[in-house]
């Protein structure tokens, strides 16, 4: 008698069979699930350990890169800043720069003129003295100092001195300068500079000094006239300026007679019968008032007219 026994699945069945119908032990399934979770946890840890590049925490915790230290040690050439550059310029260089800027921008020149302090008599005389020294230093050694050769050697320095004198003088005249004492103080020193100008042998070279006397004489006359209008005639006499001007005229050979005449007329307008030497008819002051000063000077025999 044939009996059919039910077929049971073997645990050693071929792997090629359908795995879905392969029974799995509950313990084995638990171990696999635990292993899977562990693997997933490891991946999760890896993902958490890597911050995204756009994370805000990354930007705030960035460590300075070594390249910055290298950049700090780099050096390259660059121009000086303005304050340091000005420290290196001497007075002549600074004047040259300012003059160039003012020529390009006239409004800056006007601002400098109005903002700069007024030059004092001492500072101006210092500039003129520099030109005088340059003139004296340009004369050749030996020979006649009034010769044509000497004139050719110092002509430029002579012109520089006279031009400076002509430019500075109007600054100390009214109405630009209202204080008579300052005007007279400058004119006194400026006249001494004119006295010291070279005396040339050639008549054609003497116009430099003659013109300088004419200019300075006109300046004296203007200051005297304006001072008398403001009641400054007393200052002219009490300060001894009448005698100072008389000596200047005598040293110039009468080439400042215009200033002397202006002083005489203005002191006469004030009616100055008081003062030192007023009782002496031959005093310089009385000669100025009467217009006789210089008229009774004798001319030496053989002297040129």
Curated annotation (Swiss-Prot):
Q: Where is this region: Disordered?
A: 1-75
Give GO BP annotations, semicolon-separated: nuclear protein quality control by the ubiquitin-proteasome system; proteasome localization; protein transport
Compositionally biased tracts (Polar residues): 1-16, 48-60
Gene Ontology cellular-component terms listed: cytoplasm; nucleus
Molecular function (GO) terms for this protein are: proteasome binding
Relate the protein's function as given in its record: Involved in ubiquitin-mediated protein degradation. Regulatory factor in the ubiquitin/proteasome pathway that controls the turnover of proteasome substrates. Targets proteasomes to the nucleus and facilitates the degradation of nuclear proteins.
* Protein name per the record: Tethering factor for nuclear proteasome sts1
Specify the species.
Answer: Sclerotinia sclerotiorum (strain ATCC 18683 / 1980 / Ss-1) (White mold)
């Amino acid at each position: 008698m044939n009996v059919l026994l039910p077929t049971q699945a073997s645990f050693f069945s071929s792997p090629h069979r359908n795995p879905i119908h392969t029974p799995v032990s509950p313990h084995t399934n638990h171990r696999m699930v635990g292993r899977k979770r562990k693997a997933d946890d490891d991946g999760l840890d890896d993902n958490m350990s890597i911050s995204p590049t756009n994370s805000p925490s990354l930007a705030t915790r960035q460590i300075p890169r070594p390249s910055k230290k290298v950049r700090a040690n780099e050096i390259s050439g660059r121009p000086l800043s303005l304050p340091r550059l000005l420290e290196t310029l001497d007075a002549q260089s600074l004047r040259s720069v300012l003059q160039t800027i003012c020529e390009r921008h006239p409004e800056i020149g006007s601002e400098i003129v109005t903002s700069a302090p007024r030059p004092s008599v001492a500072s101006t005389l210092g500039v003129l003295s520099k030109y005088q020294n340059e003139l004296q230093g340009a004369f050749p050694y030996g020979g006649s100092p009034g010769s044509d050769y000497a004139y050719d050697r110092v002509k430029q320095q002579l012109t520089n001195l006279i031009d400076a004198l002509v430019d500075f003088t109007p600054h100390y005249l009214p109405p630009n300068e209202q204080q008579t004492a300052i005007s007279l103080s400058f004119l006194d020193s400026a006249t001494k500079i004119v006295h010291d100008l070279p005396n040339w042998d050639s008549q054609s070279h003497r116009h430099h000094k003659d013109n300088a006397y004419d200019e300075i004489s006109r300046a004296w006359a203007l200051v005297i006239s304006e001072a008398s209008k403001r009641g400054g005639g007393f200052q002219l006499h009490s300060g001894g300026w009448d005698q100072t001007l008389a000596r200047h005229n005598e040293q110039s050979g009468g080439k400042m007679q215009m200033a002397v005449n202006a002083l005489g007329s203005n002191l006469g307008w004030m009616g100055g019968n008081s003062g030192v030497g007023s009782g002496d008819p031959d005093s310089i002051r009385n000669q100025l008032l009467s217009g006789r000063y210089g008229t009774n000077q004798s001319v030496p025999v053989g002297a040129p007219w």
